[in-house]
């Protein structure tokens, strides 16, 4: 087992009950274009078109052959675009049960599949988009080969679902999915799970299981990659989430695209935090209807540390998100708040009484408790960064855009989620995720 000591389990109220309930009926789903870094769509449908589940909606011009398929059947209700016609979302009004069928295989045939058969079925069904590269966190090219594939079967994000609960319901599909992935490449398939977690595996020669323990970010793929198979400019690995492995197993067994998602609905503003069964890309406001405390709330697709605000054209569950988090908007200001002991506020430093209340769960808000200021290196980044890098120096380079130094300090190993805790504890109130993305884009473009 690999146990990390540095990190932080956020003591946030509203942790979900780890029991799966059926979610509400969803009448609108969407694919969010801005989730796919660098993607430029070539649209295959227009508003008003009827689509079947599994039908191609658009293809990536910059990554030919990578197609994005409809998670449900229905009609194209809207295609939202932002500045410079950047695709924001393709919205589908759910109607009927028409679907496209893909290749299916008998259980005993899965162990003998060729890599080309696996690749073709994943690409045609749209499940190829479940894979992401590291570095750069992009969908891999259809003819690319990884050094390894990392299956993330654990989640240490605040308010997250326990993967063991989800996998237990679909253990056979998860095993089949692992077997299919083992046929995609001869390289290692690293299955990463929590210490002692009951996660099934397969007896394929290239599948290895690893256990991780410790606080968040022990459950992030970036942490797993760093300790098992570090990447660089000339070494790329792929990552995939456990629920997508289940979907792959079901696709190859039945020939049908599985777009079901089990998500955690949690946070201090949720009346009954719990796990819900819904669909990929579901309209978030329909999921949360009647579920929230009547207040000024911020609804987030994903983790409170690194999720996306859901509103307008973005009011949909993200492709790579397994949770919806709800906290209160922190619009009020306190007069001389820094003087009070503040037992109801949490800080990683010893500046509030809440820091010393070890078993207390706090009602976090969106308030950052201060304005923008200079980066202050007081050791907070080192306390939450378990990777073998120099976080203060790296974060400084991200702020000033020094790509050469940032690359030398290990930025290619990282994704936005890997720096979310650094943003949370930053005295200067910097958001390091967008700064990292900007540097990665520059490195990819200019080398």
Curated annotation (Swiss-Prot):
The gene coding this protein: nqrA
Protein name, as recorded: Na(+)-translocating NADH-quinone reductase subunit A
NCBIfam families per UniProt: nqrA, PRK05352.1-2, PRK05352.1-4
Record function comment: NQR complex catalyzes the reduction of ubiquinone-1 to ubiquinol by two successive reactions, coupled with the transport of Na(+) ions from the cytoplasm to the periplasm. NqrA to NqrE are probably involved in the second step, the conversion of ubisemiquinone to ubiquinol.
EC number of this enzyme: 7.2.1.1
Subunit structure of this chain's protein: Composed of six subunits; NqrA, NqrB, NqrC, NqrD, NqrE and NqrF.
GO terms classed as biological process: sodium ion transport
Stored Pfam families: NQRA_2nd (PF24836), NQRA_N (PF05896), NQRA_SLBB (PF11973)
InterPro entries assigned: NqrA, NQRA_2nd, NqrA_C_domain, NQRA_N
One GO molecular-function entry: oxidoreductase activity, acting on NAD(P)H, quinone or similar compound as acceptor
EC category: translocase
Reaction catalyzed: a ubiquinone + n Na(+)(in) + NADH + H(+) = a ubiquinol + n Na(+)(out) + NAD(+)
Domain of life: Bacteria
Keywords: Ion transport, NAD, Sodium, Sodium transport, Translocase, Transport, Ubiquinone
Family membership: Belongs to the NqrA family.
């Amino acid at each position: 087992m690999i146990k990390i000591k540095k990190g932080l389990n956020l003591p946030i109220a509203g942790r979900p009950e780890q029991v799966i309930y059926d979610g509400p009926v969803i009448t609108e789903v969407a694919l969010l274009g801005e989730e796919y870094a660098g993607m430029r769509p070539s649209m295959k449908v227009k508003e008003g078109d009827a689509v079947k589940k599994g039908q191609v909606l658009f293809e990536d011009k910059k990554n030919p052959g990578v197609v994005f398929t409809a998670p449900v059947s229905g009609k194209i209700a809207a295609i939202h675009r932002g500045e410079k016609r950047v695709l924001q979302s393709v919205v589908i009004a759910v109607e009927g049960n028409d679907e496209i069928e893909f290749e299916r295989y008998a259980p005993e045939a899965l162990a003998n599949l060729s890599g080309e058969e696996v690749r073709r079925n994943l690409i045609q069904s749209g499940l190829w988009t479940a894979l992401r590269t590291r570095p750069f966190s992009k969908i891999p090219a259809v003819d690319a080969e990884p050094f390894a594939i990392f299956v993330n079967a654990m989640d240490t994000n605040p308010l997250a679902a326990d993967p063991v609960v989800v996998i237990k319901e679909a253990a056979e599909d998860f095993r089949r999915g692992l077997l299919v992935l083992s046929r995609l490449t001869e390289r290692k398939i690293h299955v990463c799970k929590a210490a002692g977690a009951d996660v099934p595996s397969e007896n394929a020669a290239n599948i290895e299981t690893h256990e991780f323990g410790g606080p968040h970010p022990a459950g992030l793929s970036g942490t797993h990659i760093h300790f098992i198979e570090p990447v660089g400019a000339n070494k790329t690995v792929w990552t995939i989430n456990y629920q997508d492995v289940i979907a792959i197993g079901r696709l190859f067994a039945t020939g049908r695209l599985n777009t079901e998602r089990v998500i955690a609905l949690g946070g201090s503003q949720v009346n009954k935090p719990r796990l819900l069964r819904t669909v990929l890309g579901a309209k978030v406001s329909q999921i949360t209807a009647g579920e929230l405390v009547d207040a000024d709330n911020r609804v987030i697709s994903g983790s409170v540390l690194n999720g996306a605000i859901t509103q307008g054209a973005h009011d949909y569950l993200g492709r790579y998100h397994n949770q919806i988090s709800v906290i209160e908007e922190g619009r009020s200001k306190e007069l001389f708040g820094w003087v009070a002991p503040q037992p109801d506020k949490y800080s990683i430093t010893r500046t509030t009484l809440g820091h010393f209340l070890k078993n207390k769960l706090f009602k976090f808000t969106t308030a950052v408790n201060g304005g923008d200021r200079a980066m202050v290196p007081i050791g907070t980044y080192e306390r939450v960064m378990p990777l073998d890098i120099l976080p203060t120096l790296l974060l400084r380079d991200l702020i000033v855009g020094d790509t050469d130094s940032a690359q030398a300090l290990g930025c290619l190993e990282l994704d936005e989620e890997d720096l979310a805790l650094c943003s949370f504890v930053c005295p200067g109130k910097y958001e390091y995720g967008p700064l990292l993305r900007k540097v990665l884009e520059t490195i990819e473009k200019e080398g």
